[in-house]
Amino acid sequence: MSANYVNYRPEVEQKQENEEEDILHITEQMAQTNNQVFDRHRHAVRDAHAKSHGFLKGILTVPENLPAHLAQGIFAHPGYYDVMVRLSAAPGDLHSDKTPAPHGFALKILNVPGQRLLPNDPSDGHHQDFLMVNIPVLTFGTVRKYKQMLPFITEAEQAPEPVMRSLRQVMRGVDYLVNRAGFPAPASLKGLARSQHHVLGETYHSMAALRYGDYIAKISVAPESDSVKKLTGIQMQINDDSAIRDIVRDFFQKYTADYVIRAQLCTDLRTMPVEDAAVLWKEQESPHQVIGHLHFPQQDTFSPARRVYSDDVLSFNPWHGVTEHQPLGSIMRVRMQAYERSSSFRHRMNTQPRTEPVSYTHLRAHETRGN
């Protein structure tokens, strides 16, 4: 079966012309926006996914007897790992939940084996981060398109809240944004603007590709237990600016949640490219295959200590991980520099140490100090 999958080799990545200059331009523009947001709040936030909805701790189970093409990287051997998840809204500022936005599911898997991607990994070299969003593709799938789109994204995020809250205006805004940048919006992005589906019932995607051991894949997380499956497609009742925080918190006070983590392996680089994250990898060509199970028990997802820990202390970066899950494509390459620069700024301005958890003990220490 593995013969149908494209083998990873360094040549699958092809740097774009003037890519380094484009990356420098993007990171400088993002740093400028970061400073502007800091001046508004007198507190530094992430330049993407600034607002958190909740912070979860749970367990990843890697099952026994995965087939060879799936038993790759940190999923090569059965076992259990502690995990942490930060749920968030995508914009790089603190907007009202009444404003429709993509949502994020940042997964940190603790104490994984394997050679590190970065020689001087600021994450202390223990974990694997997978960053996912409830959209399967990016409108700006390359660094060049991202550079074109960036001023319009910044302009849209600075629009007055009443304008942003109108679903119709958001849908028009998506078209307006991408048309001004010179390329069409994917149907998946337009569809996102139609409603605010329950964040715990959504499927989350890495959007861009990464190495999956001997192969190439995109990673996703989907609801597994009935407790979250029944929330899929359900409209959230958002009556105040931080309603999603309360929706998530109320859920985990009563219920547990289970999700599957999946890999969609590349079968053809022509139709499933790594250098353009705007191209949807069709399930007819390669279905999503289960590689693990995530379990989240009942818990308080937004205590004051957890909010500070997830928003100010922790970092999530697709380059915090092992070589067998190397991020691929120009969008992932720009993230290497952009995320590092943003994290450094955030920790410095908020006078927080750049540390990573060795276990849940690190989180418990913060919760104890918060009591």
Predicted segment positions?
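Charged, compositionally biased non-catalytic regions
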Residues: 1-57, 121-182
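An N-terminal, globular interaction/scaffold subdomain
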Residues: 9-117
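A contiguous, surface-oriented mixed alpha/beta subdomain in the mid-to-C-terminal portion of proteins
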Residues: 178-308
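Short intrinsically disordered coil segments
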Residues: 74-80, 122-127, 236-239, 279-280, ...
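Conserved small/polar residues in nucleotide/adenosyl-binding loops
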Residues: 361-368
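Aromatic- and glycine-enriched beta-alpha-beta binding-site module
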Residues: 88-127, 198-230
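Long, compositionally biased interface segments
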Residues: 281-359
